A protein has these predicted regions:
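Acidic, His- and aromatic-enriched active-site or binding-groove loops in soluble protein domains
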Residues: 91-108, 129, 141, 162-209, ...
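Active-site and substrate-binding clefts of carbohydrate-active enzymes
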Residues: 2-51, 65, 187-192, 197-199, ...
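Metal-dependent polysaccharide deacetylase catalytic core of the NodB/CE4 family, i.e.
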Residues: 76-150, 213-233, 256, 260, ...
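Catalytic domains of cell-wall/extracellular-matrix polysaccharide-remodeling enzymes
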Residues: 129-188, 267-285
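A short acidic (Asp/Glu
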Residues: 20-23, 83-88, 118-120, 149, ...
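An acidic- and aromatic-residue-enriched active-site/binding cleft used to recognize and process polar
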Residues: 13-17, 77-79, 111-114, 140, ...
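Generic structural signal for well-ordered alpha-helices
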Residues: 57-61, 92-96, 125-135, 158, ...
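Short, well-structured secondary-structure segments
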Residues: 5-12, 18-120, 144-147, 167-172, ...
Length: 417
């Protein structure tokens, strides 16, 4: 049955990286050398927990329990979950409490929030499998919807996810791919046959024993998502101040089957501070939606509801992502220092695997986190301020220096054959 009023699919990305400490050249090769700034990582996590995670989870708990047609979805990176255990067990407990409501879906991603999908199918599959297992251990769910790091997506990746056993995948609704199509409509990737070598690697490492017969693509409605995530407190924006009833009007007028609002969870309380009214805005939405017959559904529910709909093809021959105005890989792989850093890291894969040393493997994987490369971005113009806001370093070159010293130390730790 087709509904004239679209559903809302709310998905939140929850991630905190391990930021590199001020590594000196003289530190390289020291037996007890630690790559990450323990104090800074702890302080940032606890600050964001107080401003965002704990108050937002408490509000979400209230909303999902009060409103029968209000459900949400999260993707929690493996490194975020580790920081919960190290720095804030109460944050993890609040997510587990949400899971017990039965109205929250947890998605799969790469464990280390890594760029492994760009470099190594084997590593990518192993990280996804590790993440699926961790989500099951902590929340009792086996994720069947996949979202790649930074919403990086391509036709090939969609079919890799299908072969891993996933029924759905999230992607950015990029204008240059959509052309005149509505991102709220259901989509599928084009028919695509992966090389046999790739298929064999996936079968060896995948989280589920069987491939899915098909995979649906849920596209982020970036305009409506960014109205909340980026523009909510912008006094120069024509839509300021944004009220819940106005936003609901925009949602209802946007058409299609499911309005997919995907954003960082830190939108609430961290990027948009409490004094902007962001929590009051969030609190008001479910009641308005209930009055107007709008349901907030999980990604799995949205895909099930679209079974009777004709699905458009979302054809992404090259990678798209949810970063910056370009919505491509340039936030992590635009300049020479970014490309060199990632290339040199993955040149070590064979030697790291041969060493069969869990600590060495963990260090290598921790350096794959996308944030390390994001901090090396030298973009300016429209996106420069965003990159500066998120970076803990004074410059992209400082990010590269710290990463290079960690990489040099890692290289020295590999046994010489």
């Amino acid at each position: 049955m087709k509904h004239s009023t679209p559903s809302i699919c709310l998905y939140f990305q929850v991630h905190q990286p391990y930021r590199l400490r001020d590594l000196r050249y003289s530190d390289i090769g020291q037996p007890d050398m630690q790559y990450f700034d323990e104090e800074k990582n702890r302080n940032i996590f606890q600050k964001v927990a107080e401003k965002c995670y704990l108050p937002t989870n408490a509000l979400m708990q209230e909303l999902v329990e009060r409103y029968p047609h209000f459900s949400i979805a999260y993707s929690l990176s493996g490194v975020f979950l580790e920081q919960c255990e190290e720095y804030g067990p109460e944050v993890l407990e609040s997510f587990q409490k949400l899971a017990r409501t039965g109205k929250v879906e947890f998605l799969a991603e790469t464990y280390y929030h890594s760029l492994s999908s760009l470099k190594s199918i084997e590593e990518f599959a192993q990280q996804v499998t590790a993440h699926v297992r961790r989500i099951h251990e902590l929340f009792g769910q086996q994720p069947r919807i996949f979202r790649n790091t930074e919403l990086i997506y391509s036709n090939e990746l969609a079919h890799i996810a299908r072969l891993m056993g996933f029924h759905g995948i999230l992607a950015e609704g990029a204008d240059h791919l959509l052309k005149n199509l509505n991102p709220n409509d259901p989509f599928v990737p084009p028919a695509f046959t992966l090389p046999l070598s790739v298929r064999n690697k996936i079968r060896k490492e995948r989280p589920y024993p069987k491939a899915a017969r098909s995979i649906d693509v849920l596209l982020k409605n970036y305009r409506l998502s960014d109205d909340v995530a980026f523009r909510f407190s912008d006094k120069k924006w024509i839509g300021y101040p944004l009220h819940a009833d106005t936003f609901t009007d925009w949602l209802m007028q946007s058409g299609g089957r499911s309005v997919n609002l995907f954003m960082d969870y830190e939108t609430f309380g961290e990027h948009q501070w409490a004094d902007t009214g962001i929590f009051n805005f969030l609190r008001a939405l479910p009641e308005l939606w209930q009055e107007r017959g709008i349901r907030a559904v999980t990604p799995s529910h949205a895909i099930r509801e679209a079974r009777g709909w004709k699905k458009q093809t979302y054809d992404a021959h090259t990678h798209v992502s949810w970063a910056d105005t370009e919505r491509d890989l340039s936030a992590w792989q635009e300049n020479l220092i970014q490309k060199s850093a990632l290339d040199e890291l993955f040149k070590l894969e064979g030697a790291v695997r041969t060493a069969n040393d869990p600590e060495l493997m963990r260090r290598w994987r921790m350096l794959q986190t996308s944030d390390h490369f994001y901090y090396m971005c030298t973009k300016y113009w429209s996106d420069g301020d965003v990159h500066k806001y998120f970076s803990p370093y004074d410059s992209p070159y400082e990010a590269f220096r710290r990463f290079s010293h960690a990489l040099c130390d890692l290289r020295q730790r590999i046994p010489q054959s």
